[in-house]
Amino acid sequence: MTDKLIIFDTTLRDGEQSPGASMTKEEKIRIAKHLERMKVDVIEAGFAASSNGDFDAIHTIAGLVKDSTVCSLARANDKDIQRAADALKPANSFRIHTFIATSPLHMEKKLRMTPEQVYEQARLAVRFARKFTDNVEFSPEDGSRSDMDFLCRVLEGVIAEGATTINITDTVGYGVPEMYGNLVKTLRERIPNSDKAIFSVHCHNDLGMAVANSLAGVMIGGARQVECTINGLGERAGNTSLEEIVMAVKTRKDYFGLDVGIDTTQIVPTSKLVSQITGFVVQPNKAVVGANAFAHASGIHQDGVLKARDTYEIMRAEDVGWTANKIVLGKLSGRNAFKQRLQELGVSLDSEAELNAAFMRFKDLADRKSEIFDEDIIAIVSQESALAQEQEHFKFVSLSQHSETGEQPHAKVVFSVDGKEVTGEARGNGPVDATLNAIESEVGSGSELLLYSVNAITTGTQAQGEVTVRLSKSGRIVNGVGTDPDIVAASAKAYIAALNKLHSKDDKLNPQRS
């Protein structure tokens, strides 16, 4: 019988720690729904004790997700664990994931605790977590730099207290594949009760080896859970990439001999959603989900693929969710045709009101753009879902701008503030700068623009532009996304979306690491 590899997604927790990737509750819910549709085994929805916002997001996701196990991180203390348990109460299936640092450096410099104190606190934490669930995970933070004898003692102790998953962390991405794989193997061999728990790997990508280290932990070490994120999202250089782990194991089943339960056709749609929400653009040559992942420029390669796809393609683009860039609808298409195409794309809206609003946006786009592609429809629905779920303090109404060679462009933006229309006018170094200045002339947010990027949703000169802006204020970083065939209008929408997030403030109370 083939072993199953458990996929533990931590996009909503560890992925969110990437500077600028902070998500609203509504955005987390949208991603969680996609992860469930992808059949992810465990969704780490956040860190309940870190903020009221994270608690609420976990609590809501726990009530909505039915087919995946929902998890919350908790430090090794009763208060954090109680908070996690309270947040997870609505879940069909839940896990508490508790952690404490075990490396000499972390114990001395960060925790200011002796090894004996850490050992006792780890055991007590797992014992307390078991009062709420028999699904308890323990992580020794900075495990790859911990003393082997001490690490074995701690892990033996927490397994004795009832930990069912032991997660070996390479917190700073210091490991190399053979070393890390042997670390997991040695732990499993030396700990007398290791057979009572599933071993897991959690690797960071600081040296570009997160995926390789994770796979070594599986093949050499015998781990049967991989902790990962969509697009490898995470602080510093990121985390282990879910899509790369899944497709490596599926494509090379002859080597790994493992099964994963993931619906791989949901990988690309989920990747695009995470990229849109966080503002982190996927590099074109990124494995599996990059725009060039299945592109062939070499004439020899193109000829080979045309004759037989498996000459240069080891997996099929459609198997991971890439769809042909085809024209599907036009301005004469009706609501039923639009709804049917959404169903074919596996896209759902929460209410008839959202469907009607999305259809009106589609009709508006069709009047301005002769060719409507699947990607346009997905962008419309994503934008509508975001607008329906976010609280719109500011709302874009209209834009006019004028520019001539040798003169500074002028922009006039009409938008509403809590339902009351205001008009901002300003000049700038370009039409986009003038537009954002016009908005700021009325808002006066005092924020700093950290990022402005534009991507074409489809090909051709009529393509919709997708603009991402990242704003910073008082140490808080937010993203906003806007789409429109007019790049300047898309920029205004993105900026206003970011301002709405700044307006609904939810700061983290406690730092989180693993």
UniProtKB/Swiss-Prot annotation:
Main localization (coarse): cytoplasm
Gene3D superfamilies, alphabetized: 1.10.238.260, 3.30.160.270, Aldolase class I
The Pyruvate carboxyltransferase domain, residue ranges: 5-268
InterPro entries in alphabetical order: 2-IPM_HCS-like (IPR050073), 2-isopropylmalate_synth_dimer (IPR013709), AIPM/Hcit_synth_CS (IPR002034), Aldolase_TIM (IPR013785), LeuA/HCS_post-cat (IPR054691), LeuA_allosteric_dom_sf (IPR036230), LeuA_bact_synth (IPR005671), PYR_CT (IPR000891)
Pathway noted in the entry: Amino-acid biosynthesis; L-leucine biosynthesis; L-leucine from 3-methyl-2-oxobutanoate: step 1/4
Entry keyword set: Amino-acid biosynthesis, Branched-chain amino acid biosynthesis, Cytoplasm, Leucine biosynthesis, Manganese, Metal-binding, Transferase
The protein's assembly and partners: Homodimer.
Role, per record: Catalyzes the condensation of the acetyl group of acetyl-CoA with 3-methyl-2-oxobutanoate (2-ketoisovalerate) to form 3-carboxy-3-hydroxy-4-methylpentanoate (2-isopropylmalate).
Protein name, UniProt field: 2-isopropylmalate synthase
Species per Swiss-Prot/TrEMBL record: Burkholderia multivorans (strain ATCC 17616 / 249)
Gene: leuA
